[in-house]
Amino acid sequence: MGLPWYRVHTVVLNDPGRLISVHIMHTALVAGWAGSMALYELAVFDPSDPVLDPMWRQGMFVIPFMTRLGITNSWGGWSITGGTITNPGIWSYEGVAGAHIVFSGLCFLAAIWHWVYWDLEIFCDERTGKPSLDLPKIFGIHLFLSGVACFGFGAFHVTGLYGPGIWVSDPYGLTGRVQAVNPAWGVEGFDPFVPGGIASHHIAAGTLGILAGLFHLSVRPPQRLYKGLRMGNIETVLSSSIAAVFFAAFVVAGTMWYGSATTPIELFGPTRYQWDQGYFQQEIYRRVSAGLAENKSLSEAWSKIPEKLAFYDYIGNNPAKGGLFRAGSMDNGDGIAVGWLGHPIFRDKEGRELYVRRMPTFFETFPVVLVDGDGIVRADVPFRRAESKYSVEQVGVTVEFYGGELNGVSYSDPATVKKYARRAQLGEIFELDRATLKSDGVFRSSPRGWFTFGHASFALLFFFGHIWHGARTLFRDVFAGIDPDLDAQVEFGAFQKLGDPTTRRQVV
């Protein structure tokens, strides 16, 4: 046929059987990738430390999506929440991966069957004997079926009526587990961080989809609308389908990057805004203050802080710190977290408590500045010693640790104090193992960052595709120079231009 690479899809333009075939093959490829990727991730995943080395630190991409839908156990005998299990059941991580691969194989065979047996009676118009598709009817069927699936997911899977429920956690990502969720029918259901909204929105959207599907199955479009929107043209279907996909991609890019109940931080890592707003830092200070109010010592109050909460308050877990083109997991960047050293509290020789100013997200280097409770600069690590007046040595800064591995340890040696001041810029201080994975010390993004970048990029690409194919189908007559309602056969190329009234016509 000699088609250029960008026109190869025209081979299925008027061939419904093979159009189905290539779509089934596409589904086979997607399902096959998902299953294979899941098996690869399970082969390299280390479930031993869900607190300091969770799935998002290890760069897992498909495991979090399985987990948020209720899969927590492995045939390897481990659970994602820690500990061991004896009876994981068929729907383990490996079971889901295997199901995708089996489904992929069946789709592969179905695609071959439809490619070979492309000329089916069902595609033939009884009046003309030519292949044709009743696109408005097909739209109604698809809308109805997707509505049933949507309703079923919300009413049964999420609510636990027939299914496991979904991953639900507290606002600080400490108590996450799979549980049944009741639909939230009030205004709270519109809060993106309320899990009940997932159930209620799927039930509502599914109901709407079922009703809309039945409407499109029972009501034919008006002739003017049918012609105006080119409903008889398969490229109209392509254009509107691309619109649905790019819209969904933009939505999920937003819910992933800004955070929502559908993207728990225990599975995908914290968001950059939680670092920017000092979200975990405020909660840590609130808990310490509550401990002090109960007459606990500073050391006891800090020792009660969960290591998991302290780990979230570390800039290395900020997805915006990794460059888009730095390949590898977070563990390949700053290393595998081994333990929390504790919270450093700095004091000058007058006994004032000093706070290290934290590094903003988009800085690679940042001056070490220590301020008092009123925000007045009291100490720093100067760039030029000759002009320094707030240096650690001059001000006599000391550091003492509370909680963690160095609980109760204090340092007054200026070199050591400066070392911990630099590390305090990055949030809570952790011991990191960079030897095991030969980590290079350069921050990486989490799967939250990759997912957002990928979906935002493809959404922009698909937006262009929607405009392209929509314009092609709406203005087909303009681009081709042929009136779509032309009912006369014209001898092309025999005269100066198309539409010339002197052109010989043969009425059909």
Curated annotation (Swiss-Prot):
Membrane topology: Multi-pass membrane protein
Domain of life the protein comes from: Eukaryota
Signal peptide: none
Protein name per Swiss-Prot or TrEMBL: Photosystem II CP47 reaction center protein
Localization: Plastid, Chloroplast thylakoid membrane
Name of the gene this protein is made from: psbB
Cellular component aspect of the GO annotation: chloroplast thylakoid membrane; photosystem II
Binding partners and assembly: PSII is composed of 1 copy each of membrane proteins PsbA, PsbB, PsbC, PsbD, PsbE, PsbF, PsbH, PsbI, PsbJ, PsbK, PsbL, PsbM, PsbT, PsbX, PsbY, PsbZ, Psb30/Ycf12, at least 3 peripheral proteins of the oxygen-evolving complex and a large number of cofactors. It forms dimeric complexes.
GO biological process, one term: photosynthetic electron transport in photosystem II
PANTHER family in UniProt: PHOTOSYSTEM II CP43 REACTION CENTER PROTEIN (PTHR33180), PHOTOSYSTEM II CP47 REACTION CENTER PROTEIN (PTHR33180:SF38)
Database matches in NCBIfam families: PS_II_CP47
Cofactor binding: number and manner: Binds multiple chlorophylls. PSII binds additional chlorophylls, carotenoids and specific lipids.
Main subcellular location of this protein, as a coarse class: plastid
